[in-house]
C-alpha cells in the first residue's frame, strides 16, 4: 500500500477524485482510520476541546501536539500526517521554525498554520527549509475571540474577496495544502477553482477537493454538541470501521456534505 503524499493529493485534485481526512490523537484510532483508507490524518489543536475539556483551542501547547503526533505516527502506514501548530507557536518566522521542526521530528509530514497575509514570510521560510505547510483560512479557531465566537466567515463581498486573495497568496508563498473552514460554499468553490493546490473543506460545502471532520463528531462521542457541518456516522452504522467507510464513501460519491451541512 503506497503512502499518501502531497503529490498524491495533487493528483487526486487533477483527476477530480475526492479525498478524506480525519483528526486523530492516538495510535489505536489512527490505525483504524489508516486501515480503512483515510487519506489524511490531522493531529489537531482541537484536542484541547475534545480531549482536554477546554472551551477553545488556545491552551494547547507544541508539546501537546508533539506527544500526540508521536502516538499517531506509531499507528499508521499509509495516511499523510499533518500536525497543527498551536496558538502563538508561530508568531514570528523564527519561532515557527523552531516549533515546526519539533513537530516534524515527532513524525509529522506537514504542519498546519492558521492565518492569511501576515503568514506569507513564515510559509516561504518553512517551505524553503524542507517543512511542508498546510494553510488554514476562514473560521480559524485560534482567532475565535477576534471573531466574537465560532462564526461563519466570508459572507460579505469584502471578506470573501480577502479570503480568496489570501488563499492565492498562500499558494504563491509555498503552501502545499489549504483548509477552509466555515465559509459559504460559493466562496469555497471559487477558492478551489482558483488554486492549483488541493483544498480541504470543513463546513465549506461539497465542491472542495477533500473533506475533513473531527473524529469525535463522526463517532458521536463529543460532549453533546455536533456542529451543523458534521455528521454522526457511528449512529447509522453501529461500528467504528463501518462509520469510517461510510464517511469515505459519501465524500467520494458526493452525498456528504449535503445542503444541511453547508452554509450560504
Swiss-Prot record:
Binding site for Mg(2+): 45, 84, 114
Location in the cell: Cytoplasm
Keyword RNA-binding (UniProt): no
GO CC annotations, alphabetized: cytoplasm
One Pfam family hit: Pantoate_transf
Details of cofactor binding: Binds 1 Mg(2+) ion per subunit.
Cofactor(s) in the UniProt record: Mg(2+)
Presence of keyword Magnesium: yes
UniProt keyword terms in alphabetical order: Cytoplasm, Magnesium, Metal-binding, Pantothenate biosynthesis, Transferase
Residues passing through the membrane, by range: none
UniProt catalytic activity: 3-methyl-2-oxobutanoate + (6R)-5,10-methylene-5,6,7,8-tetrahydrofolate + H2O = 2-dehydropantoate + (6S)-5,6,7,8-tetrahydrofolate
UniProt superkingdom: Bacteria
Organism: Shewanella sp. (strain MR-4)
Functional description taken from the UniProt entry: Catalyzes the reversible reaction in which hydroxymethyl group from 5,10-methylenetetrahydrofolate is transferred onto alpha-ketoisovalerate to form ketopantoate.
Family the UniProt entry places it in: Belongs to the PanB family.
HAMAP family attached to this UniProt entry: PanB (MF_00156)
Pathway: Cofactor biosynthesis; (R)-pantothenate biosynthesis; (R)-pantoate from 3-methyl-2-oxobutanoate: step 1/2
Protein name per its UniProtKB record: 3-methyl-2-oxobutanoate hydroxymethyltransferase
Binding site for 3-methyl-2-oxobutanoate: 45-46, 84, 112
Any one GO molecular-function label of the UniProt entry: magnesium ion binding
Subunit structure: Homodecamer; pentamer of dimers.
Catalytic machinery residues: 181 (proton acceptor)
EC number: 2.1.2.11
GO biological process: pantothenate biosynthetic process
Amino acid at each position: 500500500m503506497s503512502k499518501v503524499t502531497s503529490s498524491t493529493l495533487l493528483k487526486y485534485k487533477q483527476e477530480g477524485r475526492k479525498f478524506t481526512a480525519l483528526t486523530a490523537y492516538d495510535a489505536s484510532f489512527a490505525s483504524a482510520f489508516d486501515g480503512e483508507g483515510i487519506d489524511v490524518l490531522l493531529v489537531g489543536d482541537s484536542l484541547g476541546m475534545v480531549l482536554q475539556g477546554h472551551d477553545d483551542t488556545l491552551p494547547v501547547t507544541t508539546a501537546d501536539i508533539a506527544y500526540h503526533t508521536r502516538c499517531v505516527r506509531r499507528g499508521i502506514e499509509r495516511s499523510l500526517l499533518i500536525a497543527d501548530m498551536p496558538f502563538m507557536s508561530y508568531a514570528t518566522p523564527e519561532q515557527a521554525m523552531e516549533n515546526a521542526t519539533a513537530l516534524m521530528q515527532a513524525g509529522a509530514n506537514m504542519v498546519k498554520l492558521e492565518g492569511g497575509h501576515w503568514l506569507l514570510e513564515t510559509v516561504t521560510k518553512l517551505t524553503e527549509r524542507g517543512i511542508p505547510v498546510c494553510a488554514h483560512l476562514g473560521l480559524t479557531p485560534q482567532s475565535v475571540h477576534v471573531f466574537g465566537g465560532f462564526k461563519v466567515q466570508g459572507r460579505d463581498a469584502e471578506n470573501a474577496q480577502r479570503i480568496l486573495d489570501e488563499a492565492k497568496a498562500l499558494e504563491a508563498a509555498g503552501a502545499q495544502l489549504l483548509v477552509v473552514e466555515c465559509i459559504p460554499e460559493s466562496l469555497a468553490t471559487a477558492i478551489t477553482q482558483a488554486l492549483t493546490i488541493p483544498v480541504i473543506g470543513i463546513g465549506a460545502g461539497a465542491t472542495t477537493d477533500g473533506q475533513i471532520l473531527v473524529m469525535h463528531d463522526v463517532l458521536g462521542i463529543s460532549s453533546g454538541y455536533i456542529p451543523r457541518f458534521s455528521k454522526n456516522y457511528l449512529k447509522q452504522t453501529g461500528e467504528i470501521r463501518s462509520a469510517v467507510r461510510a464517511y469515505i464513501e459519501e465524500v467520494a460519491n458526493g452525498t456528504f456534505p449535503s445542503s444541511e451541512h453547508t452554509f450560504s
